[in-house]
């Protein structure tokens, strides 16, 4: 999948050409538009119990969790449409610069498939292999994923409770301090 490789390679501005990177003024409208803000308010209302529980356990402000989910997937509207297995295989073997990293992610992904009895080609995510509402890489699911809804499995694709708990756990384990 050469398209994946193109997406993973940063664009370089050629001398004498205009830099097309967006400044904050232009970029802000993408993340702070009315549609996304309305989705965020509704997501917060729908998941208030899990958000407050995450605050109590992990000491992470619900607004931070809400912000991450909003930026990553627009509250689940866009979790990616790439077959994660295809992406990780391609990046593991055809993207030499980071092949070792993606081979480890592929291994973790295969374990997740097996443990959760998932069909390999059904799981979709980003072109880099990130999945679910928080767009976690497979190794992050393994290390920081939480069964926050108590159903016996970690499901950041369909369980908003697991997503909230996993994000809070991730931040906590990375040194998040409330306040």
Language-model features: locations:
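Functionally critical loop-and-helix segments that line ligand-binding/catalytic clefts
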Residues: 135
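Cell-wall glycan-active module
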Residues: 1-124, 129, 139-179
């Amino acid at each position: 999948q050469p398209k994946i490789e193109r997406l993973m390679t940063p664009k370089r501005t050629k001398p004498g050409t205009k830099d097309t990177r967006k400044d904050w003024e232009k970029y802000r409208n993408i993340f702070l538009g009315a549609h996304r803000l309305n989705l965020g308010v509704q997501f917060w209302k729908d998941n208030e119990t899990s958000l407050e529980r995450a605050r109590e356990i992990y000491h992470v402000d619900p607004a931070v969790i809400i912000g991450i989910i909003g930026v990553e997937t627009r509250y689940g509207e866009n979790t990616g449409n790439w077959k994660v297995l295809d992406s990780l295989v391609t990046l593991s073997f055809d993207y030499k610069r980071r092949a070792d990293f993606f081979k480890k992610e592929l291994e973790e992904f295969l374990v997740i498939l097996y443990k959760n009895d998932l069909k390999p080609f059904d799981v979709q995510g980003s072109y880099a292999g990130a999945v679910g509402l928080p767009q976690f890489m497979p190794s992050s699911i393994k290390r920081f994923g939480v069964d926050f809804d108590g159903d016996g499995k970690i499901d950041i694709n369909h369980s908003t409770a697991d997503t909230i708990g996993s994000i809070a756990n991730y931040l906590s384990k990375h040194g998040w301090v409330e306040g």
